[in-house]
């Protein structure tokens, strides 16, 4: 174990245990490589975990954050960093809303079903700074992802973040928990989320 630690640094479980202790969160390690960190924020629970996608010859690991909440008006958004093919995608008709902050607009593709609320959400400087601090990001409000039946009750959506790889940077993980808290609060201020428990356990 000492040699492995020298080669690869602290394990994910060690890092996540430290994170939970510093945030007053719950860390539930899993012997088989899963595990999660959960923190209660008001009526919501923000969950950090990982998942794996196997494509035959290769296996891809992802870090994700989720926070189910009662969506008051069906508002959705999606944000990710621009890349080399963004220009082509926009030419082919991909939506890219401008939020009114030049540096942010130049760095990110922002999509949503209510442009006024998208601009109001990202008018929050704290939200923009936390998003800009992420080297990679796929952050959105998305609906129920059950293939054959609903996982969440009617009216419940989730705030969702994912990125390739396993994040073991404590400060970055703290920033992501903070981002979720700020966005949930802002969604409430915009009338797009209810301050009630979604009655969902992850």
Report the location of each language-model feature.
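Membrane engagement elements in two modes
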Residues: 10-11
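Charged, low-complexity intrinsically disordered regions
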Residues: 3-5, 16-202
């Amino acid at each position: 174990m000492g040699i492995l630690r020298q080669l690869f640094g602290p394990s994910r479980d060690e890092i996540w245990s430290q994170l939970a202790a510093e945030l007053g969160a719950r860390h539930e390690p899993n012997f088989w490589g899963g595990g999660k960190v959960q923190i209660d924020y008001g009526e919501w629970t923000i969950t950090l975990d990982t998942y794996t996608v196997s494509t035959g010859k290769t296996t891809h690991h992802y870090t994700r954050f989720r926070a189910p909440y009662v969506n008051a008006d069906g508002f959705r958004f999606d944000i990710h960093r621009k890349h080399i093919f963004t220009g082509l995608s926009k030419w082919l008709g991909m939506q890219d809303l401008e939020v009114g902050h030049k540096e942010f607009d130049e760095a990110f593709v922002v999509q949503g079903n209510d442009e006024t609320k998208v601009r109001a959400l990202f008018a929050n400087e704290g939200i923009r700074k936390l998003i800009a601090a992420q080297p990679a990001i796929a952050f959105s409000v998305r609906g129920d992802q059950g293939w054959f039946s609903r996982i969440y009750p009617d009216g419940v959506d989730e705030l969702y973040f994912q990125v390739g790889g396993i994040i073991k940077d404590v400060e970055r993980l703290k920033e992501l928990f903070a981002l979720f808290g700020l966005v949930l609060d802002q969604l409430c201020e915009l009338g797009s989320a209810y301050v009630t428990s979604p009655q969902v356990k992850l």
